Regions:
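Active-site entrance/lid segments in N-terminal catalytic domains of soluble metabolic enzymes
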Residues: 1-83, 95-98
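Alpha-helix-loop-beta-strand connector modules within alpha/beta enzyme cores
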Residues: 54-63, 101-122
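Glycine-enriched alpha-helix->loop->beta-strand junction motifs that scaffold or abut catalytic
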Residues: 63-65, 83-88, 118, 141-144
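Glycine-rich beta-to-alpha transition loops that act as phosphate-gripper elements at the mouths
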Residues: 69-75, 121-134
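Catalytic cores of alpha/beta
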Residues: 76-84, 129-140
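Glycine-rich phosphate-binding active-site loops on the catalytic face of alpha/beta enzymes
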Residues: 90-102, 140-160
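C-terminal helical cap(s) of enzyme catalytic domains, especially alpha/beta-barrels
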Residues: 156-174
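Conserved small/polar residues in nucleotide/adenosyl-binding loops
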Residues: 180-184
């Protein structure tokens, strides 16, 4: 936001003066990807539109470990994952970065959980920034949540100590004593 940008003038100026913006973790590191145009072509080739739930069932047959499928956003896909032998599903819109018009994971969680009951573990990913967010997801039916930004922010700020601190904050926010006022 604007206030954050104003608080970091050196960074803002370097972004404004940058000649070109690129995906530094891919461009120049993957053969044939040198700019955003070739990145788009490379990305499109990474997905096989012919994949079906039968392929997922085949993977489960070949794999003797747990199969956890991330990206479930409908009850139908949840049931399909279950019928393929998935051990757990992760309700996730991948941070909204793939389809920014997709609903938030927390919005679809209750319907998906209701359609599956306790037949499969249901995890939720996306929007978890605090213990309250974890509690909300658990209350709506998630068996577990995943976090990303909270620990990444901690890592960026203080390294390993920051990750430890971020996790401690979330754990402390989940302390039952913190929610005694919610009990009847």
């Amino acid at each position: 936001n604007l206030l954050s940008t104003l608080g970091h003038p050196r960074w803002a100026l370097s972004m404004l003066l940058a000649r070109r913006r690129h995906f530094g973790n891919i461009v120049g590191h993957v053969s044939g990807v040198s700019d955003t145009g070739s990145l788009s072509e490379w990305t499109a080739k990474q997905f096989d539109p012919a994949l079906t739930w039968k392929d997922v069932a085949w993977i489960k047959e070949m794999w003797d470990g747990p199969l956890i499928i991330k990206g479930i956003m409908t009850p139908e896909d949840g049931r399909a994952a279950l019928s393929c032998g998935a051990d757990a599903i992760v309700i996730s819109n991948h941070g909204g970065r793939q389809l920014d018009g997709a609903p938030a994971a927390i919005q679809v969680l209750p319907e998906i959980k209701s359609s599956l009951g306790d037949t499969i573990e249901v995890w939720m990913d996306g929007g978890i920034r605090s213990g309250q967010d974890v509690l909300r997801a658990l209350a709506l039916g998630a068996d577990a949540t995943m976090i990303g930004r909270s620990y990444v922010y901690g890592l960026g700020a203080l390294g390993e100590a920051g990750v430890t601190k971020a996790l401690a904050i979330i754990r402390n926010e989940l302390d039952p004593v913190s929610y005694t006022h919610l009990r009847a």
